[in-house]
Amino acid sequence: MAIKRCPASIDVVEAAKIRIRNVFRNGLPVYMSFSGGKDSLCMSQLVMNLIQTGEIDPAQLIVQFIDEEAIFPCMEEKVREWRKKFILVGAKFEWFCLEVKHYNCFNELSNDETFICWDRYKKDVWVRQPPSFAIRDHPLLRPRIDAYQDFLPRLCTAGITITGIRTAESVQRLQNIAVMLRAGKSMTNKHQVFPIYDWTNNDVWLYLLREKVDIPEIYLFLWQSGTKKGQLRVSQFFSIDTAKSLVKMNEYYPDLMERIIRREPNAYLAALYWDSEMFGRNT
């Protein structure tokens, strides 16, 4: 599919602000997906600035964080900081620690590509403990059956969801959003808006720098270990993007690999084959 890019008369930051203001003007609850990663930090700073200038109502805002258990310590720390910020300005922050299915690249060989976050039958080997204030269950959730992508849409039907998805992340995302934009008004049937969809990687890092937003230190560690700027992605440990960097991060988090292997025995594959075709490298 051919995709035509149209230049705008305003910069991407101002465009994102306009989109966010328009969402809040509907008067509906606004659900914001939050991960603690660079894109969601940009979204959060944009929203926080608009709250502080009185341009949007924080009482409409419900921030949602799906805690996938296997996350870096600095990511949890950053999410805690932002949880406090949002609560202090009058927004609601939902921190979910749920038994949801997640993709597990280490289980490809056994034909089982799922991982159950916060598995009740594996409490003794959880990578970390959930916060005391976390939401551990929900009537709309089908535990151990749903992925969070199944659960959240059911939870957010009463409002509009804003998410920090960007077309620069992948060709697939570019094509998907192009199709949605071409659909015109029908795209709103999904109740989703992507305020920073047109931001480049440079836009993201420049905005975080100019706004003096603290980022999780894992990004600095990845950069120091030789990861290219366009590949600075952080997700749950058993996703392909993060799995291939686990061995490098063992230098910065000495006990982390041990805890990961205890939770997911096949994770030893990362130590043996991280620089091979298994993790996207052709050597």
Task: For every predicted segment, state its role.
Residues M1-Y31, K38-T283:
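Nucleotide-activated chemistry modules centered on ATP-dependent adenylation/adenylyltransferase
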